[in-house]
Amino acid sequence: MIPLGEFLVEDEVTFNESRRKVLRLAQALGFDEIGATRLAMAYSELCRLGVDRPGGVRTHLGLEEQPGGLALGVDFAFSANTGAPLVADAFFRSFTAIPGAAWSYRGLLPLPDHCFRLDEELLESLRSRLAHPSRE
């Protein structure tokens, strides 16, 4: 996976900040308003499972080469057993446990533009957006 950024979601502030950034990332990757909002909603629902627990939930975002083009990958590493997140199967094309990582899952969602090309300038721009605080 080509890493884009990561978040430790452990309270309301980090939850809201990371959700906004995921929404903007989805828009930058070519998802329409509905697709971007659905991704942010699924991300929110999954983060809610771990946000109030000690250690929160760590998320990693990246792009992964898949047959037919790139996919957005979102890893969720929970600090405790949350059970299998049911909402994920309804949204991600693939949602599986990460081998060897307790309570960790990877969701994959193909980018809407199968011809999407990632260059170094765009990659650095996406990483910068995720790394710096939102202005809201």
Segments (PLM) and residue ranges:
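Conserved ATP-binding N-box helix of the HATPase_c
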Residues: 31-58
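Conserved beta-strand-loop-beta-strand hairpin that lines the nucleotide-binding pocket
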Residues: 1-4, 49-136
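Generic alpha-helical secondary structure
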Residues: 15-18, 32, 36, 40, ...
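Helix-loop-beta hinge of the Bergerat
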Residues: 2-31
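GHKL (Bergerat-fold) ATPase N-terminal catalytic module, capturing the glycine-rich phosphate-binding loop
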Residues: 26, 33-40, 96-100
